[in-house]
């Protein structure tokens, strides 16, 4: 469980400084992202109790899912940075707010679509209880990260 908290703090640290500085240190951010990905996989592994045959089928699917999820995460970071830019300049227009809202909703839709696709794939190889457990782990991690991000991102003025 300590891994989850460390993971959350690391991810939250990535987005929130955007409201305080002009340019993030890309190298440091990439190192942090790589560490977070590795720690997340450790959290999942420690909590799934997979047999060897289950692991052989689960982990390749997990890795594919995380790779596709990364593109959604990249969009989320891009959206947060765009908001940070206009927020810091006090330049958010109604049109800009609508664009941010539409992108946020599209990100949520795409994440749900991806989760449904990969849940169906995992269900072919794991018992339903383990599928549910994995979804709980994934959802708790993502919810905690979103919460931490939300606490650091100011409301639209």
What are these regions (language model features)?
Residues 29-30, 43-125:
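Amphipathic alpha-helical segments
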Residues 21-27:
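Charged, compositionally biased N-terminal leader segments and the immediate start
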Residues 2, 78-80, 137-142:
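N-terminal hydrophobic signal/anchor transmembrane helix of membrane proteins
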Residues 16-20:
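Sec/Tat signal peptide C-region and signal peptidase I cleavage site
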Residues 5-15:
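Bacterial N-terminal signal peptides
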Residues 1-4, 21:
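Positively charged n-region of N-terminal signal peptides that target proteins for export
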Residues 38:
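Active-site-adjacent substrate/metal-binding segments within catalytic domains
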Residues 28-31, 35, 112-157:
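Amphipathic, charged alpha-helical segments and their helix-to-coil junctions
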């Amino acid at each position: 469980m300590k891994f989850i908290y460390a993971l959350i703090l690391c991810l939250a640290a990535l987005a929130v400084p955007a409201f305080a500085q002009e340019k993030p240190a890309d190298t440091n951010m990439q190192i942090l992202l790589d560490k977070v990905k590795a720690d997340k996989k450790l959290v999942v592994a420690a909590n799934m109790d997979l047999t060897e045959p289950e692991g052989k089928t689960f982990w390749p699917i997990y890795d594919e899912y995380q790779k596709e999820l990364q593109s959604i995460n990249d969009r989320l970071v891009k959206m947060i940075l765009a908001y940070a830019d206009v927020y810091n300049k006090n330049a958010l227009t109604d049109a800009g707010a609508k664009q941010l809202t539409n992108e946020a909703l599209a990100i949520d839709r795409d994440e749900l679509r991806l989760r449904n696709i990969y849940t169906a794939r995992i269900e072919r190889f794991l018992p339903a209880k383990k599928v549910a457990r994995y979804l709980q782990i994934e959802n708790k991690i993502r919810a905690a990260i979103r919460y931490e991000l939300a606490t650091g991102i100011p409301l639209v003025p």
